[in-house]
């Protein structure tokens, strides 16, 4: 293959303002806690969020922990991932509040909360 026949592909990351995942694992297996590195006395529900731009995960974590009785399990400001834990109703309430603030106050595109 000659230099002239090679194609060059450039991939760009162009973030939008969106919540792409809002999920509740109501009764997680204990292995999930171990694999995530969550060290908690009580194995409650887990809430998962994925947000773009990733810096908004900081806002989501703040809203979630102030809105309800949940613990912050994980936040990654580089990937936009947030993991919270608590009883099912607290996790659901926290996720609803996060979606409300990001969607209505900050004009993010949002998703529905899913559950397993």
UniProtKB/Swiss-Prot annotation:
One of its GO terms (biological process) is ethanolamine catabolic process. The keyword Mitochondrion does not apply. Pathway: Amine and polyamine degradation; ethanolamine degradation. The keyword Nucleotide-binding does not apply. Residues 8-108 form the BMC circularly permuted domain. It comes from the Bacteria. One of its GO terms (cellular component) is bacterial microcompartment. Its main location: other. InterPro entries: BMC_CP (IPR044870), BMC_dom (IPR000249), CcmK-like_sf (IPR037233), EutS/PduU/CutR (IPR009307). It is found in: Bacterial microcompartment. CDD domains: BMC_PduU-EutS. Keywords: Bacterial microcompartment. Pfam families: BMC. Belongs to the EutS/PduU family. A component of the bacterial microcompartment (BMC) shell dedicated to ethanolamine degradation. Expression of the eut operon may allow this bacteria to use ethanolamine as a carbon, nitrogen and energy source. Unlike its S.typhimurium homolog, does not make BMCs when expressed in E.coli. Targets at least 2 proteins (EutC and EutE) to the interior of the BMC. Proteins such as EutS containing circularly permuted BMC domains may play a key role in conferring heterogeneity and flexibility in this BMC. PANTHER family: BACTERIAL MICROCOMPARTMENT SHELL PROTEIN EUTS, ETHANOLAMINE UTILIZATION PROTEIN EUTS. Homohexamer; unlike its E.coli ortholog the hexamer is flat. Its pore of about 10 Angstroms in diameter is closed in the crystal structure. Interacts with the N-terminus of EutC and of EutE, targeting them to the interior of the BMC. This is Bacterial microcompartment shell protein EutS. It comes from Clostridioides difficile (strain 630) (Peptoclostridium difficile).
């Amino acid at each position: 293959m000659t230099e002239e026949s090679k194609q060059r592909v450039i991939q760009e990351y162009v973030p939008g303002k969106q919540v792409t995942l809002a999920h509740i694992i109501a009764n997680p297996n204990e292995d999930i806690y171990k694999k995530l590195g969550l060290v908690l006395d009580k194995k409650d529900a887990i809430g998962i969020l994925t947000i773009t731009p990733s810096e908004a995960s900081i806002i989501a974590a703040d809203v979630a922990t102030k809105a309800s009785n949940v613990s912050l399990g994980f936040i990654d400001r580089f990937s936009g991932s947030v993991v919270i834990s608590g009883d099912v109703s607290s996790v659901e309430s926290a996720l609803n509040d996060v979606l409300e603030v990001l969607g209505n106050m900050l004009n993010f595109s949002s998703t529905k909360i899913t559950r397993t």
